[in-house]
Design a protein with these regions (language model features):
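P-loop NTP-binding core
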Residues: 1-345
Length: 345
């Protein structure tokens, strides 16, 4: 297995079905194409972690909640360990077997699927604190760290150091980040190590302005300016292999896919406007209350009998997986994908 394709799923606007899409897209990569997939929850709201724990609890016949997770089994631990390294010069150590929630999926008739994993997050970290903390608290802790001229560089390369140290991307075919609807330092960490970013979006007037703005922010304000600011450091031959993530090109916009569309709404004019500037996938994820409800219970759309013909969630997400893999030139069996789309996961 080579290095994983790394995708950040992101939209700075909330309420677009991002986490639901992360879960179903990743389940599709695993079920339809047989790929080993790691999800990493970087959203302080912990929604993806909640969903995955529901599935894992069903599989293990033991209810596990976010507050039951020890800190060393969360992504919070990664950021905390590197903050310790900065302040106390303590070298981080990670046990991926402990950190990663492995083979978490239990689907139709409690069928089990390996190869769909998660690094969870928590909002119940009470280590060295008299109240529970989450990733948003760590965001503040990171911002408080001042390291002279290299402050920003250190802030946005924490995950780059972790990926370099653990070689985690050699264990998977795909790694997908679920990021908060904000341009946070933690989001920037995900973008630094990513090959692509994928935008789920409602097709409305705000999106026609917001998507180009977010694209320019990522490409220019974040990456171009950082590379210019730290050009000498990045050109250095010193042993800083983790900086290779910044030495490469900025992550590419993989594309945009429409979410939460109502079947009686015509938004073709907005789609044409967005498609003039960016890749807009044909795949449309329709607005079904059932999809959100079953996903929140830890069931992917491929495990649920929601029969709505061409609007069915399993058909829509199956098409999205097909389009994404085709767009990046990733080899897969298209006939097998289309066949498995109508089978139970």
């Amino acid at each position: 297995m080579g290095k994983a394709i790394k995708i950040t799923m992101i939209n700075y606007k909330g309420g677009v079905g991002k986490t639901t899409s992360v879960y179903n897209f990743c389940a599709g990569l695993r079920f339809l194409c047989g790929k080993r997939v790691l999800m990493i929850d970087l959203d302080p709201q912990c929604s993806l972690t909640n969903i995955c724990l529901k599935s894992y609890s069903r599989m293990s016949a033991k209810q596990i909640k976010i507050e039951d997770l020890s800190i060393d089994k969360t992504v919070n631990y990664i950021f905390k360990e590197y903050l310790k390294q900065i302040s106390l010069s303590i070298e981080p150590h990670f046990d991926l077997d402990d950190l990663i929630l492995k083979n978490l999926y239990s689907g139709h008739n409690n069928s089990k699927y390996d190869g769909l994993d998660l690094i969870p997050t928590t909002m119940f970290d009470t280590e060295n604190s008299n109240y529970p903390k989450g990733l948003d608290d760590l965001e503040i802790d990171i911002a408080r760290q001042h390291l002279g001229d290299n402050t920003l560089l250190n802030h946005i390369t924490i995950l780059a150091k972790f990926f370099t140290c653990t070689k985690i991307e050699e264990l998977y075919d795909f790694i997908v980040f679920d990021c908060p609807p904000a341009n946070s330092l933690i989001t920037q960490n995900a973008l630094v190590v990513s090959d692509y970013y994928l935008i789920p979006s409602i097709m409305d007037d705000m999106s026609s302005y917001g998507i180009p703005h977010m694209h320019n922010l990522i490409q220019n304000t974040i990456f171009r300016q950082v590379k210019e600011l730290y050009a000498k450091v990045l050109e250095s031959t010193l042993e800083t292999k983790y900086l290779d993530y910044l030495r490469k090109n900025a992550p590419g916009l993989l594309g945009i896919f429409e979410t939460l569309r109502k079947t009686n709404v015509d938004n073709s004019s907005i789609r044409r406007l967005i498609a003039k500037k960016h890749v807009l996938f044909d795949s449309v994820i329709y607005n079904h209350v059932d999809t959100a409800r079953t996903t929140s219970d830890g069931l992917a759309c491929f495990s649920v009998d929601i029969n709505k013909d061409v609007y069915s969630p399993h058909t829509c997400y199956g098409k999205l997986v097909d389009e994404v893999l085709t767009h990046i030139g990733y080899p897969f069996d298209k006939v097998a994908l289309q066949t498995k789309t109508n089978q139970w996961m």
